[in-house]
C-alpha cells in the first residue's frame, strides 16, 4: 500500500508539474500566457467561445458562420450564427454576437465580452434588448413571446471558466426569461441543443402547481412504499422548498430511518408531476448505488409496478443517457471523470435538472484509508472543492440527505429544511438505543504506548511483508493510539484485545458484528486472529470475513456479492472492515460494533454508530452494543 501510494504520488507530481508549471520558467510562461489572454479583444474571445460551443454540440465559427455572410438557420442543423441582426438600438449595428438555432428555431441569444470585462450584468440590459427586438422577417423562427421577449434563453460570456472568487467576471451567465421572477446566474459549461429543447418543453409554473396539489396516497400504501410519517414530512418539506423556488434543500435524517425509501418517494412524486425532466441520484460508492437500484426494482408504486417499470432508470454501470432516461445513478468519482476532469465532457450542464445527493456528509477522507482515486487529490480541501464543482456543474436543483450535517454540507446545501434525529427515532420506536460502551484496555495502552530504552524491536517492511533484523532503541519511543497497526504492529496486543472481545460475541447467533480496522492489513490480522481464537469451539472460517475495497482482489461485483451475503445469510456473522461498510449499508441484524481504531472525525464516527441502529425483530434486537479499544478516554 505504501509503495503504491509513493508511486501514485510521483505520478501526480509529474502531472501537476506539466499542468501548472512548477519551474520558474514554466510559471513565468504561464503567467505571460494568462496576461496575454486578459488583453484579448472581443473578437479573439469569440474564437475561444467558438471552440467551447463546438464541444457542446453546436456548429460555431464566428468568422464564417456569420449573418453578414449569408448564414441562416437550416433544418436539421444546430448553428450558433454570429452577429445576428436585430432591431435593437443598443448599438448602431443592433446585432447579437450569437443567435442559437436548433434547426430553424431561434432558442437563444448571447453577447460576448472581452476576457477582462465583467459579464454578470450584461444580460440585464443588452441581451434582453436584443431579445425584445427581433426583426419582423425573423419572427417565423421564434418559438414564443414572453412578456415582450421573443427569445426564451439569454447568455453572456467572456470565455473564462467559472471561478467562485471571480463570480461576476467568469462563467457563462444564463437567464430564462419565460418567468419574470427568474434571475441570471452562472453555469459551468454551455447547454447542448437538446438541453435547450428539453428546457423549452418544460413548464415550471404548471409543474409546481401540479406538485403542490399532488396526491400523496401512494406514499402510505401498505403494499407499496408504506412510508412513515417523518418520511412523508421530509418529502413535503423538500417539495415546499422546490415550489418556493429554492435551488437547494437539505434533509437531515438519522442513519437507519429509511433515506433510500424517502428518496424513492421523492423521485416518483417529482416525475409524476413533471416538475423535473431527468434526475441524478448521486452516491459516493458503487455499493450504495447498487443498494438503491435494488430498492427501485423492489418497491411497488403504482398498479403493482416498480419505479424501473414505470420510468427508464440507468444503473450505476450504465453511462448512456438518452431522452427517455428519467433517473440515472452515478458515483461522485464517475461524474468527475465525465465532467470537470474530462478534456471533452460527455455530459452537459442540462443533462439533469434535479440532483439528489445521498450521504451528503461526504468529506472526511483524512480519517479514512484513501482509494487510489482519492490519493490523486492534493488534500481534503482539494477533494471537497472538486466534490462541490461536480455537484454545481449541472444546472439543477439539489436535494441532499445526510444523517450528520457538517459545515461543508451546509455551505453547499444550506441549513436543513427538515430534521429527524436519532433520539427522536429511538423515542418513536423506529431505531434501537445503545448500551454504554465496553472499554477494553491493555497494559501497553495503560503505560502510554511507550517502548523503553534498550528494548529490541523487529522492523516491519510493509512493501515486502518481511520482518527485518531487530534494532535496539537508543531512547524511549512514544506512540499515539492512532498509530497502532499503522506505524507499529503488535500481534500480542491485538490477540489480547480480541480474546476479550470474543467473550461478548457468538458467531453462531443471529446477532451480527461489525469490526472497524485501521487499514486493510490490520483487517487481515484481525480476521486471522479471531479465527484462531474461535477454532477450538468449532466455529466455521466462513463466520468471520474481511469486507473491504480489496476483498476478492478489488472485484466490485464480488464485493457487492459478499456485502449481500453478510446482510442475508447466516455467514459471515462477523465482518471486519475499514471504510467500505461505514456509511449507507443496510444490515439490520448488526447488533455489535467493535472499534479497533481511533476515530478523528465526528461525522465518520456517527456514521459508524449508525450501522447498528436499525430494528431487526426477527432476532429480537432491542439495543446495540459497542466495544471500543481506543485507549484512554
Give short role names for the model-derived ranges.
Residues 326, 465-469, 475-575:
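Conserved C-terminal RecA-like helicase domain
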Residues 1-278, 287, 291-303, 324-327, ...:
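ATP-dependent helicase/translocase motor core
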Residues 143, 334, 364, 377, ...:
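Conserved RecA-like P-loop NTPase helicase motor core
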Residues 365-446:
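Post-DEXD/H (motif II) to motif III coupling segment of the RecA-like Helicase ATP-binding lobe
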Residues 61-64, 278, 293, 300-317, ...:
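Conserved RecA-like helicase motor-core motifs
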Residues 410-510:
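Interdomain helical connector at the RecA1-RecA2 junction of SF1/SF2 helicase-like NTPases
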Residues 327-386, 563, 577-578:
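Conserved RecA-like ASCE ATPase "motif II neighborhood" in helicase/translocase motors
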Residues 251-252, 276-285, 511-519:
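Conserved RecA-like ASCE P-loop NTPase motor core of nucleic-acid helicases/translocases
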Amino acid at each position: 500500500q505504501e509503495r503504491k501510494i509513493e508511486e501514485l504520488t510521483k505520478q501526480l507530481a509529474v502531472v501537476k508539474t506539466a499542468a501548472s508549471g512548477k519551474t520558474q520558467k514554466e510559471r513565468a510562461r504561464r503567467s505571460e500566457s494568462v496576461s496575454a489572454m486578459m488583453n484579448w479583444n472581443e473578437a479573439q474571445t469569440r474564437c475561444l467561445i467558438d471552440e467551447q460551443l463546438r464541444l457542446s454540440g453546436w456548429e460555431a465559427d464566428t468568422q464564417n458562420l456569420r449573418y453578414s455572410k449569408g448564414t441562416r438557420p437550416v433544418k436539421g442543423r444546430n448553428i450558433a450564427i454570429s452577429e445576428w441582426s436585430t432591431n435593437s438600438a443598443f448599438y448602431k449595428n443592433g446585432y447579437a454576437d450569437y443567435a442559437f438555432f436548433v434547426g430553424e428555431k431561434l432558442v437563444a441569444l448571447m453577447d460576448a465580452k472581452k476576457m477582462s470585462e465583467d459579464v454578470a450584468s450584461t444580460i440585464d440590459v443588452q441581451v434582453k434588448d436584443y431579445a425584445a427586438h427581433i426583426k419582423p422577417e425573423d419572427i417565423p423562427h421564434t418559438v414564443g413571446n414572453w412578456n415582450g421577449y421573443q427569445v426564451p434563453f439569454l447568455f453572456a460570456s467572456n470565455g473564462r471558466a467559472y471561478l467562485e472568487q471571480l463570480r461576476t467576471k467568469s462563467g457563462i451567465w444564463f437567464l430564462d426569461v419565460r418567468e419574470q421572477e427568474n434571475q441570471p446566474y452562472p453555469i459551468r459549461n454551455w447547454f447542448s441543443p437538446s438541453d435547450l429543447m428539453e428546457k423549452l418543453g418544460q413548464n415550471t409554473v404548471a409543474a409546481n402547481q401540479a406538485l403542490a396539489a399532488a396526491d400523496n396516497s401512494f406514499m402510505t400504501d401498505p403494499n407499496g412504499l408504506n412510508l412513515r410519517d417523518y418520511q412523508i414530512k421530509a418529502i413535503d418539506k423538500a417539495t415546499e422548498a422546490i415550489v418556493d423556488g429554492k435551488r437547494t434543500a437539505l434533509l437531515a435524517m438519522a442513519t437507519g430511518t429509511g433515506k433510500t425509501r424517502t428518496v424513492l418517494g421523492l423521485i416518483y412524486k417529482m416525475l409524476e408531476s413533471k416538475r423535473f425532466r431527468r434526475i441524478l441520484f448521486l452516491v459516493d460508492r458503487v455499493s450504495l448505488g447498487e443498494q438503491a437500484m435494488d430498492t427501485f426494482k423492489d418497491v411497488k408504486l403504482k398498479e403493482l409496478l416498480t419505479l424501473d417499470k414505470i420510468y427508464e432508470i440507468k444503473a450505476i454501470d450504465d453511462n448512456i443517457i438518452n431522452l427517455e432516461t428519467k433517473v440515472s445513478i452515478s458515483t461522485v468519482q464517475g461524474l468527475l471523470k465525465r465532467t470537470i476532469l474530462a478534456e471533452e465532457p460527455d455530459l452537459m450542464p442540462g443533462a439533469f435538472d434535479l440532483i439528489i445527493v445521498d450521504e451528503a456528509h461526504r468529506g472526511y477522507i483524512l480519517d479514512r484509508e484513501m482509494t487510489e482515486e482519492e490519493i490523486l487529490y492534493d488534500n481534503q480541501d482539494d477533494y471537497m472543492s472538486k466534490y462541490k464543482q461536480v455537484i454545481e456543474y449541472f444546472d439543477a436543483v439539489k436535494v441532499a440527505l445526510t444523517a450528520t450535517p457538517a459545515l461543508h454540507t451546509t455551505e453547499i446545501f444550506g441549513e436543513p429544511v427538515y430534521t429527524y434525529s436519532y433520539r427522536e427515532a429511538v423515542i418513536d420506536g423506529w431505531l434501537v438505543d445503545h448500551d454504554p460502551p465496553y472499554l477494553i484496555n491493555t497494559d501497553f495502552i495503560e503505560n502510554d504506548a511507550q517502548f523503553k530504552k534498550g528494548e529490541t524491536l523487529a522492523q516491519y517492511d510493509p512493501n515486502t511483508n518481511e520482518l527485518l533484523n531487530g534494532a535496539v532503541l537508543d531512547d524511549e519511543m512514544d506512540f499515539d493510539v492512532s498509530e497502532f497497526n499503522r506505524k507499529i504492529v503488535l500481534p500480542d496486543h491485538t490477540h489480547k484485545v480480541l480474546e476479550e472481545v470474543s467473550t461478548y460475541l457468538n458467531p453462531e447467533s443471529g446477532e451480527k458484528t461489525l469490526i472497524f480496522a485501521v487499514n486493510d492489513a490490520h483487517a487481515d490480522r484481525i480476521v486471522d486472529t479471531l479465527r484462531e481464537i474461535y477454532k477450538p469451539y468449532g466455529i466455521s472460517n466462513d463466520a468471520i470475513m474481511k469486507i473491504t475495497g480489496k476483498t476478492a482482489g478489488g472485484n466490485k461485483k464480488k464485493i457487492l456479492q459478499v456485502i449481500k451475503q453478510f446482510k442475508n445469510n447466516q455467514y459471515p456473522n462477523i465482518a471486519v472492515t475499514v471504510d467500505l461498510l461505514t456509511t449507507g449499508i443496510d444490515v439490520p441484524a448488526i447488533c455489535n460494533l467493535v472499534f479497533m481504531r481511533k476515530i478523528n472525525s465526528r461525522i465518520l464516527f456517527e456514521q459508524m454508530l449508525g450501522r447498528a441502529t436499525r430494528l431487526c425483530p426477527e432476532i429480537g434486537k432491542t439495543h446495540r452494543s459497542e466495544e471500543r479499544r481506543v485507549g484512554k478516554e
